[in-house]
C-alpha cells in the first residue's frame, strides 16, 4: 500500500511547466475552506460553447484543488454552482436580486450563501468568470464576494509571429504549435491548451501567423487548416485572426486567382480580397479579422502605388465589415534614414505617416501602435501617436516575447515597463489623458480599441522557454483586462498559482521579478539611450556601436565628447513637438525632462549633470555595475527555494539565472569599456578597465591555442580571446597564480558558438574544479551566434575553490 502512494507523490512533484498557472495544485493541509457546492448547473450544454467549457473546467479544477467531485447538470438544484450567460440565467430563474451592469465579455461572480453564480454578459464572459473563481480557490481564497468585472477595452489580442515552415520570428520557446512544412499541423492538442491559457486571462483573439506574412496562408488547403485551429480554440472563446501579405494577389497562390497588381484601389484587387475573405468566413464564420504590416521593413503596401495607408487599410476593412471583422493596421512604418541629417529621426515616422490620415480610416480599422516610437526598447517614451489620432481607433502593441530584453534567458518582469506607458498622461487639450484611457476609447469617444501583444509561445514545455517568463504572459492578460491593477500583486497571484502558497516562495520570486527590469535597464542601456544590443544581428548581447553609422535610425550619436539624440524643436529633430503642448514643453527642456529619458530627447556632454548630481558617464558606469550586481543575486535567491520547488522546474530555471548572472557581467563590461574608450573619462571608483583579479587568456601560456582579436572589441576584456588552432585541436592554457592563498570564486569567460559543442575543464593544481560544455543551444532558446561576440559570450563561475599562491 505504501509504494503506490509514493508513486503518486512523485507524479505530483514532476512538473514541466506545461500547465502554466493552471496547475490546480491540491491545497496544503494547513488550509481549511467552507462548503463548496457539489453540483454545477451549466446553462448551455453545447460542447463547443464556452459555457460548457466553463462547466468542465470547474469540475476539473475543483476536483484537483479540493479533491471534491462535482456533478455537472443542466437542472436547477439547491446549493449549486450556476454557470451561464446573464440572459440564460434570467430566462431560467428570473432577475437577480441586484442590478448587474455588464459590458461585452464581462461577468458576475457571487459566492454569497451556498450558491455560486458565475454569469457572463456573453458565453466567453461566463468562462472568464469560471477561471476567476478557480483562481481564487487555487490561491486558497474563499472570501465571500459578489461583484461584476468588465474588461477595460474590447480588443485583447495576442500576435504570434509564426511562419508556415514552423519557425517563429523572435520565438525563444521552440517551434510553432500551429504550422510545419508549409501547412497547419495535424495534432492541435497544444493549440487547445494554449487557448485555455489565453481564456484564463481574458484574451479574446489571436493572430496565428507572422506579421511578415507568407501569402500561401491563403491557399484553400491552408484556409481549411485554419478552420481546424478556429474550431479548436472556439470552445475557449478565442477567435483567430490572420496576418496578410499585402501583395498576395500577385503571388500566384495555389487555388486563387493571380493578378498583375495589388493596387488597393484597383477593382480586380478589391474583388480578389472580397472573394478570399468570403472563403475564409465560410470556414471560420467568427474570424476576428486581419492584421496588416505594410510599407515597413521591405514589406509591400499601398504606398507602392502612391495610395495612402488609410486606403490600404480600408481595402481589408471593407472586405471583413459584412462579417463583423476588424482590421488591425500596424503603425510600425518607417524608412531608412541618413544619419548625417541632424533632423532625421525614425521616432517621428508614426506621427508623420498617420496623423495626416486621422479620420480617413474606416470604423472597423484599429491602428496598432508600438508602445514606444522605436522598437520594444528597455525604456522609451510613450508613442506620441496615441495623442494624435482623435478620430481613429487605436490599440497598443506590447511584446511579451523578450526580443530586445534578454530573449527569455534573462529574468525581466515587463509590466512595470508597460505601466510607464499605460499610465502616462499625454495632457491632450491640457486635460488628463492617460494612455490607457485613450486605448479604452474614453478620451476620444471611440468604441473600438485596446491591446495586442507579441507572445510567441512554442512547443517547449514551458511555452516561452522560461518558467519565470510566463509571468509576463499572465500579467499581459490581466493588464489588458484592467490596466490599473498593481503589477506586484499580479506577480504574487501568478506565483501562488505557479509555485504554490508558501509565502517565502511568493515573496522571494516576486521580489526578484520586481528588481529585474530595473536591473536589466541598468546593465543594458540607461537614461533613454535604448537597449544597447546588436540591432543588426541577434538583438541579444551588447554591441553599442551597431546603433550608429547605418540607416536604421536607432542612433545614439555618441562621439568623444557627447551622446544622445537631440529631439527638441529648437535645435533637433522636432520629435518633442509631436506631443501635446504641456508634454512637449516638458521634453523640450533638459531641466524638466526626466533623467531616465534624458538621452532620448537631448544631445549632451558626458559631463552633463543629472538631477542626482552625477554626470551622465558616471551614471553609466554606476548603473551597469549596480545592475549586474543585482543579477548576481537571482540564482542564490532561487537556490534558497530548492526544497520548496519541484526538481525539474527548479533546475531548468536555475540554469537560466546562472546564465543571466554571467551574461550581465559581459553586458556590464562591454558597455562601460565602450564608453570609457570613446570618452576617455575615468570611472570615479576606478572599476572600469581595472581588473586586478582578472587573468587575460592571451597572457597565459598557450598550447594549441592562438590569440584572436574580437569584434566588437569590448566583448573581450582586453579586446582579445584565444581560440584553438583548428576545430580539431585539443588545447590548453595555463598560468601560475600569484594571488594570496585562500578560497575564491573563479569565473571563466568563454564563447559558446552555435554549431559546435566544445568541452572545457578547469584545474587548479591537480584538482579539477569544473567541467562543462558549450551546449547552451540545448537549454536556451535565444537567437544563436556563429561569431565571437556579445551574444555567444558566456561566463561560468565555480565557487569556494581552494587556491594556493604559486
Set out the residue ranges of the language-model regions.
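Acidic, contiguous N-terminal accessory segments
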Residues: 13-113, 143-144
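Acidic/histidine-rich, surface-exposed loop or edge segments in extracytoplasmic proteins
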Residues: 31-49, 175-179, 209-212, 596, ...
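Feature activates predominantly on carbohydrate-active enzymes
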Residues: 49, 54-57, 61, 96-291, ...
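Extracytoplasmic
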Residues: 685-806
